[in-house]
A protein has these predicted regions:
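Structural preference for beta-strand elements that scaffold enzyme active sites
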Residues: 80-82, 113-115, 136-140, 176-180, ...
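Surface-exposed amphipathic alpha-helices with a cationic face
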Residues: 108, 129-133, 164-174, 244-251
Length: 282
């Protein structure tokens, strides 16, 4: 690992189409400009790689003292802040720098709720369980495939089986935890495994296809016929068909970007029409 660079733009509120549809648009990234998970299809990577601003071997690290000062200025009624917007806040370098660990403690101190989004089983390590306040903590662990060997071909995160064990551990301990199936690629998911995960909640986000995505997944893209902006999506009826096969959870929500489908899931399907994340707010 080379010289550690400071990641300065650690907090932002997302606007545009995504921000308008997301109930929790404020993101706090403890690491940036690279992620050691280096998922080949990563949205952040696609934006930064061609500008030579993506360094998966040596991500930049946010200054925890600056983060603490920022958190202290937040109003007491701040909605949940998402930890891990552009990069994973529990990527392996967290074990070295512990910026996420200290950020969680700072958020707890100010009573600010937080939504952790990660592909890492580290979030379920005992040292993090000890500091996470169940009244403030919401956790989404992302799974893209149920096949450990397949996952190795496009991401360097914890194996799917490890993530599932982390989900089940956090569920058993009473945390507000969700399996985030994102992106949902039906060809990559064994429904018998998925539907037997011991977790109450699942959040599904279907694959959005552009020229970057088409490089990485060996699937039939001919079904992705609905175009919006620079992405192609599955038709709503096809999405409904795939969703109907997910049966092992008490609550299922869909995070959607395509406008017609967004309105359908919001008004006719999601348990909480105002919050597709379906967080358990105390």
């Amino acid at each position: 690992m080379g010289e550690v660079k400071e990641f300065k733009s650690f907090m932002k509120t997302v606007g545009g189409n995504e921000g308008n549809k997301c109930h929790y648009p404020t993101r706090l990234d403890t690491y940036g400009c690279g992620c050691t998970h280096d998922c080949k299809y990563c949205y952040a990577k696609s934006l930064l790689d061609f500008r030579n601003m993506w360094n998966p071997l040596n991500p930049s690290v946010a200054d925890i003292e600056k983060i603490k000062r920022k958190i202290k200025k937040l109003p007491s009624d701040t909605p949940a802040i998402r930890l891990g917007g552009m990069t994973d806040c529990f990527q392996p370098i967290e074990k070295i720098h512990r910026v996420t660990y200290e950020t969680i403690k700072a958020l707890n101190k100010q009573k600010i709720p937080y939504l952790i989004v990660t592909k890492s089983a580290i979030v379920a390590d005992d040292e993090y369980i000890e500091i996470m306040d169940k009244k403030l903590t919401h956790i989404q662990i992302t799974v893209t495939t149920t096949d450990d060997e397949r996952s190795k071909t496009y991401e360097k995160a914890s194996l799917p089986s490890e993530r599932i064990r982390a989900i089940e551990k956090l569920q058993a301990l009473g945390f507000d935890v969700t399996l985030r199936l994102s992106p949902y690629i039906p060809e990559y998911v064994d429904l018998d495994i998925l539907n037997n995960v011991k977790c109450d909640k699942i959040l599904v986000e279907f694959l959005r296809v552009n020229s970057w995505i088409e490089k990485w997944f060996d699937i039939d893209y001919s079904e992705y016929t609905v175009k919006q902006n620079s992405y192609k999506h599955l038709p709503l009826e096809k999405k409904k068909e795939y969703i109907s096969k997910i049966t092992g959870f008490k609550e299922i929500s869909v995070c959607e970007d395509e406008t017609e489908a967004y309105e359908y899931w919001k008004n006719n399907f999601n348990p909480n029409k105002d919050d597709c994340c379906n967080l358990r707010i105390n």
